[in-house]
A protein has these predicted regions:
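Structured alpha/beta or helical-core interaction and ligand-binding surfaces enriched in interleaved
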Residues: 1-142, 148-173
């Protein structure tokens, strides 16, 4: 069993770099400043959707999700969130083998890829039973990914395709 940090950044940021990268709340940013964050969300979304396509036999756990979570989003973010969910559902409905439970799973996958407005540390967990991996939320754009089996190359290649990075050891040192 190996646990890695799944991240959009290749290296850990020091305090000064982190302050430059996360210098404003998302709600205070203009459209141009939001672009890198939206790109990050799309990377995670593509990665999680690819995993789901590979292994539809998954178990997920959300600590909670309430309507008040939307209070932290600006109006444009709420619109972006709702439109993205609709787009995912339309895309899934176009597939021949679409189950009703897929709709909820797609929404949950999108929530997990979205900034950590909806969750808290270890608030989300997804277990893909055929691939034998567990993904646990850590912070914004950063997750633990635990390989419970020795066959992890397929997922590591998927991480690279999604332009994400796996780091090992830095969280324990």
């Amino acid at each position: 069993m190996k646990t890695y940090v799944l991240d959009v950044l290749e290296n850990v940021l020091n305090e000064e770099e982190a302050n430059q990268y996360y210098y404003k709340a998302f709600i205070e940013m203009n459209k141009k400043e939001k672009i890198p964050y939206i790109v990050n969300e799309n990377r995670y979304l593509k990665f999680l959707l690819r995993l789901y396509k590979m292994d539809k036999n998954m178990v997920y756990k959300f600590r909670f999700f309430e309507k008040w979570c939307f209070d932290f989003l600006s109006n444009s973010e709420k619109l972006h969130y709702k439109n993205s969910i609709r787009k995912l559902r339309r895309k899934a409905l176009g597939k021949k083998k679409f189950l009703n439970k897929d709709k909820d799973i797609l929404e949950m996958i999108f929530k997990m890829s979205f900034r950590d407005v909806f969750g808290f540390q270890k608030g989300y967990k997804i277990y893909f039973s055929n691939l034998k991996i567990l993904i646990t939320s850590l912070t914004d754009y950063c997750y633990f990914i635990t390989f419970l089996d020795k066959d992890e190359e397929k997922v590591k290649n998927l991480v690279k395709k999604s332009k994400l990075f796996l780091r090992w050891g830095e969280i324990w040192s």
